[in-house]
Amino acid sequence: MITIDAASDPWLRAALPPRDARRRLLKVLSKLPSAVVDTDITLEQFSDTGFGHKFLGQDGQATHFMANKGQPQRGAYAAGIDKVFGPAERAVQLFNEMADDSDLSTRTTSRLDDVSIALGAAVNAVQDSFSPTHVQRDQRGDIMRIQAWRDQLGKDHNAGDRSWQDGGGNLTKLGRLCMEATILLLQYFVLRVVNKDADAERCRRKLMKVYLHPADPSRSGWSP
């Protein structure tokens, strides 16, 4: 995963509203790195094992921008997009329902944590879409194929997830695209929270057109 100090990003800070809402947003963004990593620790991941696959309806990794075995590409793509914007919208809703920093959820944790967890799930999904073991992209970065977890070995999958960085520790082309897409998603979240819906919609459209666009959805394998 690519971690970004979202709370220190100049654009994000400039977009934040004053006083209490600004403080809460900065706290949410500061919690993101751990929230993104923790997204991978779920019961659904149990289905990635041969034993667990018999009892759960889908592969756990399919919740992270991947396909179930035999799933049409169009359906896998739609599910992946929903895993990006569904949690992002949930994060907006949770933030808007929050009275103050100390407002507790039923899990006795701050609702700030709930917002970060939802937003972290969205970031996790968009970042997974830039792993070649999750998604095959063309030279421009357009999505060509959503990969199926059941077709892969664990070691190969893990190696692909680390391909955002080269041997010298620098971002690869995919890594740079991933970082740009992550920042754009965070911009979308902030703009939605501060009720700048027109600007947020422009961010969403750019994210879809530039970073989450299928290369040719009319070709074979992408039929409904």
Language-model segments: what does each one mean?
Residues 1-117, 132-224:
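N-terminal, motif-rich segments that launch catalysis or mediate targeting to/interaction with membranes
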Residues 115-126:
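Short alpha-helix carrying the canonical HExxH Zn2+-binding catalytic motif
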Residues 129:
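Nucleic-acid-interacting cores, centered on viral/eukaryotic replication and modification enzymes
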